[in-house]
Structures are given as C-alpha cells and as structure tokens.
C-alpha cells in the first residue's frame, strides 16, 4: 500500500483528543468519533448536551455505544505498529536472531519461540504478544468502566451534599419559625418546653451542618482520587502494546483499592420535639373525610429530587419494583372554602404515599400530571429511595429531614391563614407547615399510593 494512503488510513483511526489510536471508540450524533475515556474526561461536568470539539454541534452524552467497526480497525492498526516494532533489528532475539513474538506472563518479558521452550521458561504461561496486549487492554477498559460508574455516583452524591449544605441553614430557620408559630397558638405555660425544643433544634442543626461540610470534603477528595486513577488507567491503555505489557504491574490491584470505602451522603435527621397538647388543640377542628377511590396511571406523581422515583405504597416485606405498580387515588368527597379543619391518615410502616389538599381545578386536570412544586398541590409525601425513606412537602417542593411517621399523620387546614400543617400524631410533633398557600377554593382532600 502507498505510504501516503497508509498514513491517511491510520489518521482516520486516531482520536482527535488524545492523538492515539482509538480505544473503545464512540461515535456521537454529528458523526465524529472519540475514545470513550477521552470523551468522558473532557465532558464530565456537563450533564446533558455537549459540544463536539470538532464541529461544535451539540450532542447528548447518554447511552453511548462502542463503534465496533472502528474498534476492530484501530486494533488492526496497533497490530501493524507492533509488527513493525518487533521486526526491527534491535528487537531481534540476541541468542537465536528470531523475532520475539511471545510474551511470558511470569517475568513479563518478550521471547522468541525457541526461548519460550527453554529450560528457564518452559513451565511459564506464554501468550502471543498481540493477544496478551489486547487482553490486558480489555481488562483495563473493564476496570475503567467500574471506576467511571463510581465516579459518576460520587459526583451525584457530591452534588446532593453540596445542595444540602448550601440550603441547610435556611431549612433549620424555616423549622424554627414553624415551631415558634405553633407555640404561639398554645397556652403560655408551654414557654419552657418551647425554649427547650428550639435550643435542641439549633444544636442539632449546627452539628449536622458541620457533618455535611466534612462529608462534602470527603466526596470531593474521593472525586480527585477516582479521576486520577481513571486517568492513569487511560494513559496505560494508550501505551504501545509492548510498553503496556511490561509496565502493567499492580495497576489493577491499586484501582480495586480505590473503589473501596466510597463515601455515602449523610441522611440528616432533625428531631421533632413533642408539643404538649398539640393534638387536643387540633381535635377541636376534627372532621371526618369521606373518600372516593379511583385507579390511576402508575406515574401520576413524580418526585424530581429523588430522580424520578414514583410515589406509591408497598410493605417492607415486598421486594421493591418486583411487579408492575398500580396507582390509586382517593379524593375527598367534601370540599372546603373557608374555616379550619383537621383530619388524620393512618400510614403505618408503609412508604411511597402522598396526601394533602389540592385546588379543585387540579382534580379536573390530566391525572398524569407530575409534582413540580407549582401552586395547587399542598402535600406531604414519603418515598423510598434505595434503603431509606424520605419525607417531602410541596408548594414548593422541599425535603423534610425529620423521622418518618410510623402510625398516624394529621393534617390541619387553615383557609384564612392560607396554611397547611402536618403533624406526627404519635410524637405529638409538627412535621411542617406550608405557609402562604396559593389556595383557589374550593379545596379538596387527596390521597395517593402505589401498590407493587
């Protein structure tokens, strides 16, 4: 083949980012190709759309598939380079003047066929050099994929922890205000209890804030270690075959150790101190709610903070997501336009539920609407996220960092004050009060759960 044509052919097999032959090449929407590791490293911090470095067109970086044809061609190009290298005079076996084609996996040396049969190497494990190099490169790529998945998980966790740290003081202040407002409705003799509960909340809030900072620092440090290890594996992967085999060493073992002890996000939880006489006061406004049941689509609600996890209702003994979920809505027959009302819902040990009140027009809308924090839905919900449950309220959408209720939850609706309060009945404590609700009466009770 003409040398000029050969150079053009080889040039098509070179990644424009690292300027080496492709390893695990991916072709993006615009048609340009890159090594997967190079693509990852260059666009790690851009979550969705990225610009191609070659043509500046935007592309999505999800579900990238290996370009098998390009990978095979790049592998052939490496074999040609290896053959040219091994055919040079200085690489010939000094004893037998034969081309070294064999790799000894025991002492990581290159041997000619005669040397591999010698007394010294006879019982060692041998492989053709090009086979051994490709096998080692594939092992590196597999380990890199594991590293990258952990790095992405750590990156997501770091974002969660960063957001929690940034918002934590405001969240604690909101809870303090809600509890103060609740005590203002109680008799004056509760002053000492109020003081104690507020002081405990402030103390716990400061402790958690400090722990969040430490957790965030650990994750940031782990991110640097994971990225550094990934870059080292990537560099090793791009080495010429002979260099790769002889420098391989303990790199896989070291990469395994990096994957151990991955820091996990905190599950911060503020104690909700009991308010003496809370339920007695609320029971003055007790009403009995009659429910109208209907089956709904399984994605009626979506909780964006917990990454698209459906709200539902399943028991702890049932494996999660083992069957097709069925959603059920229960609308209150009654509607409210003014006054104060209180009712309770038994949630037990279940999770994946939501209940509260909604503006009447919400009932008439498409049942596949999602919780997006917009006006009209005033709910408390509980979702199962991996191994833990999280509480949230809507309008606006907000995580509630308090213990999950395990029996009954009360709802207090004050139409004139434009507030919806949720209480843990067993603990006689305030979960949260949604202030400044954008009511558009009539208001209707709503309950949703999903069975799996």
From Swiss-Prot:
GO terms for molecular function: protein kinase binding; ubiquitin protein ligase activity; zinc ion binding. Zn(2+) binds at residues 93, 96, 115, 121. Pfam families: SPRY (PF00622), zf-B_box (PF00643), zf-C3HC4_4 (PF15227). The gene is TRIM49. PANTHER family: E3 UBIQUITIN-PROTEIN LIGASE TRIM. PROSITE patterns: B302_SPRY (PS50188), ZF_BBOX (PS50119), ZF_RING_2 (PS50089). It comes from Homo sapiens (Human). The keyword Cell inner membrane does not apply. Keywords: Metal-binding, Zinc, Zinc-finger. GO terms for cellular component: cytoplasm. InterPro entries: B30.2/SPRY, B30.2/SPRY_sf, Butyrophylin_SPRY, ConA-like_dom_sf, SPRY_dom, TRIM/RBCC, Znf_B-box, Znf_RING. Residues 269-452 form the B30.2/SPRY domain. Gene3D superfamilies: 2.60.120.920, Classic Zinc Finger (3.30.160.60), Zinc/RING finger domain, C3HC4 (zinc finger) (3.30.40.10). A zinc finger (B box-type) spans 88-129. This is Tripartite motif-containing protein 49. It comes from the Eukaryota. Belongs to the TRIM/RBCC family.
């Amino acid at each position: 083949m003409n040398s000029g044509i050969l150079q053009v052919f080889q040039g098509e097999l070179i990644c424009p980012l690292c300027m080496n032959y492709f390893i695990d090449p991916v072709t993006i929407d615009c048609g340009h190709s890159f090594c997967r590791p190079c693509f990852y490293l260059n666009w790690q911090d851009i979550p969705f759309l990225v610009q191609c470095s070659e043509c500046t067109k935007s592309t999505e970086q999800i579900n990238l598939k290996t370009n098998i044809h390009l990978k095979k061609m790049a592998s052939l190009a490496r074999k040609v380079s290896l053959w040219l290298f091994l055919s040079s005079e200085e690489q010939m076996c000094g004893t037998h003047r034969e081309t070294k084609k064999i790799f000894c996996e025991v002492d990581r040396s290159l041997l000619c066929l005669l040397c591999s049969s010698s007394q010294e190497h006879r019982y060692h494990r041998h492989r053709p050099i090009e086979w051994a190099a490709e096998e080692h490169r594939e092992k590196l790529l597999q380990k890199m994929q594991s590293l990258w998945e952990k790095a992405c998980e750590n990156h997501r966790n770091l974002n969660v922890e960063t957001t929690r740290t940034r918002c934590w003081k405001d969240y604690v202040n909101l809870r303090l205000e809600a509890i103060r407002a609740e005590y203002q409705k109680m008799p004056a003799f509760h002053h000492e209890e109020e003081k104690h509960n507020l002081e405990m909340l402030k103390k716990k809030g400061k402790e958690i804030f400090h722990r969040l900072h430490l957790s965030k620092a650990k994750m940031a440090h782990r991110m640097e270690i994971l990225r550094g290890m990934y870059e080292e594996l990537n560099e090793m992967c791009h080495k010429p075959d002979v260099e790769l085999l002889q420098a391989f060493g303990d790199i896989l073992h070291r990469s395994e150790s990096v994957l151990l002890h991955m820091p996990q996000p905190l599950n911060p939880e503020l104690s909700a101190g009991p308010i003496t006489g809370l339920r007695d006061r609320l029971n003055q406004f007790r009403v009995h709610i009659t429910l109208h049941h209907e089956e709904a689509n399984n994605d009626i609600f979506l909780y964006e903070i917990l990454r698209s996890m459906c709200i539902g209702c399943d028991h702890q003994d049932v494996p999660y997501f083992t069957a097709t979920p069925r959603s059920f809505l229960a609308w209150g027959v009654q509607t409210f336009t003014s006054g104060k009302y209180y009712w309770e819902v038994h949630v037990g040990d279940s999770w994946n539920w939501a209940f509260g009140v909604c503006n009447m027009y919400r009932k008439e809308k498409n049942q596949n609407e999602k919780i997006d924090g917009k006006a009209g839905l005033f709910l408390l919900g509980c979702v199962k996220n991996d191994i833990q449950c999280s509480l949230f309220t809507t309008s606006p959408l907000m995580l509630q960092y308090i213990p999950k209720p395990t029996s009954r939850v009360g709802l207090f609706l004050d139409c004139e004050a434009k507030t919806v309060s949720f209480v843990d009945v067993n603990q006689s404590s305030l979960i949260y009060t949604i202030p400044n609700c954008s009511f558009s009466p009539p208001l209707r009770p709503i309950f949703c759960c999903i069975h799996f």
